[in-house]
A protein has these predicted regions:
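Peripheral, non-AAA+ core regions of ATP-driven protein-machinery
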Residues: 3-203
Length: 203
């Protein structure tokens, strides 16, 4: 079963290099089994936030360190796994550049520190959830592309390889230069494979 989750981001301009980051709605730790033992580690969703900040600076040329940034996953569904990577980048980039996210687009995918989009689990349930929610365009990692996606009606599934591909398909162009406001609120739509946490995917 899949689900559609909104990702919110706000950005408030502060003194240079004095920005702070807050993330809410994600699990701080996760449990996983290995060789008959149950172990705990920092959640992959929380860890992927570090990748997001790096990509914003190195791949998109932005300065998140100059803003107080708040990323939130509303709705009471605890988020875990790396699949929220490109959604978080998109939401924050939207807030920093004042370019709105297209409201008919949803996405899923892990992002590396080099701005590459990596494959995730549960891709078919995620795409189906998007279609059922009325989404007309879905961005998926190129590694997850399947021929069956070409047969779906009413929804376009686009494979993406880099975070630049994501920005091109997710952010709307503005007709004139608009200064970034002191506080900007933007959101993107994340696809989850299940409303419950299961190891390794975002569920």
């Amino acid at each position: 079963m899949g689900t559609v989750i909104e990702v919110e981001a706000t950005a408030m301009l502060v003194d240079p290099n004095q920005g702070q980051l807050k993330v809410t709605g994600v699990m701080e730790e996760e449990e996983f089994g290995r060789q008959g033992r149950t172990m705990r580690r920092r959640s992959q969703a929380r860890s992927s936030v570090d990748n997001v900040l790096t990509v914003l600076k190195t791949s998109l040329g932005l300065r998140p360190q100059d803003y107080d940034i708040h990323i939130n996953f509303p709705g009471g569904i605890p988020v875990d796994g790396p699949s929220a990577g490109i959604s978080m980048v998109t939401a924050v980039a939207s807030a920093l550049t004042n370019r709105p996210v297209a409201n008919h687009v949803a996405m899923t995918g892990e992002v590396t520190i080099h701005g590459l989009v990596k494959g995730v689990g549960g891709i078919v349930p995620k795409v189906r959830a998007a279609a059922e929610a009325g989404i007309t365009k879905v961005l998926v990692p190129e590694e997850n592309w399947q021929e069956i996606f070409q047969t779906l009606e009413g929804i376009e599934v686009i494979p993406v390889r880099t975070i630049s591909d994501v920005m091109e398909n997710a952010l709307l162009q503005v007709t004139e230069q608009v200064p970034v406001p002191i506080t900007a609120r933007h959101h993107s739509t994340l696809l989850g494979a299940s409303p419950k946490i299961s190891s390794g995917i975002i569920p």
